[in-house]
Amino acid sequence: MPRQQPAAARPVRRRSYDQFCASARALDSVGDRWTLLIVRELLAGPRRYTDLHADLPGVSTDVLASRLKDMEQGGLAVRRRLPPPAAASVYELTERGHGLLPVLAALAEWGAPALTERRPTDAVRAHWFALPLLRALTGLTWEGVLEVRLDEGEFHVRTGSGAAVEPYGFGPAPRPDARITLDAELCLELGRGDVTLAEAVKDGRIEVAGDGPLAAELRGG
């Protein structure tokens, strides 16, 4: 009787590039698929697991749970229990996790030229346009909360120094200092630098609402 060959062992996944290099160390933490997109979601604030899964179409529950565990172990995120009556757990970024904002902003700027026609398989969420838009808002001097309305939905962003702490959030703002209405394509044009904020407002492609100093600055006042 022929001897049965042992089953080939599955290759062990490398958890580190084992290179004394800052870029390699960074990729050890965020180089896995989905990790940076989870960071993108958590930059908007604490999220429940179910909310993360809903806003990351295509990720399996096993992979999402694994990435979140890796992020906790790597010091990028923490899991905490909300007080009653919520009685739910949320994930939120640590200070080190928030430090990835410039990385995500640079990736959004680099990837914006690749967003031409939307593919039939492309999912979309309104707050995914926050990062390209933030690039165009960096010149604003007034600190405040700006509500953004697109056909795809609403989100809000912070202007001025507050943008470094909590750059954007989901849905309409409770008490926005100003409100703008535009389309998603213009968000991408602003992110690519094809048009400036002032030009878009002047040409009527951005509708500004509000009476405070932030709205006045957006109008060029």
What are these regions (language model features)?
Residues 67:
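Residues within the DNA-recognition helix of helix-turn-helix
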Residues 76-77:
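Short hydrophobic beta-strand motif reused across regulatory alpha/beta modules
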Residues 96-160, 164, 213-221:
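Acidic, aliphatic-rich amphipathic alpha-helical segments
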Residues 1-30:
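N-terminal leader segment of winged-helix/HTH proteins
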Residues 21-60:
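N-terminal helix-turn-helix DNA-binding core of bacterial DNA-binding proteins
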Residues 173-221:
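C-terminal interaction segments
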Residues 31, 83-106:
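Basic, amphipathic "hinge/linker" alpha-helix immediately C-terminal to the N-terminal HTH DNA-binding motif
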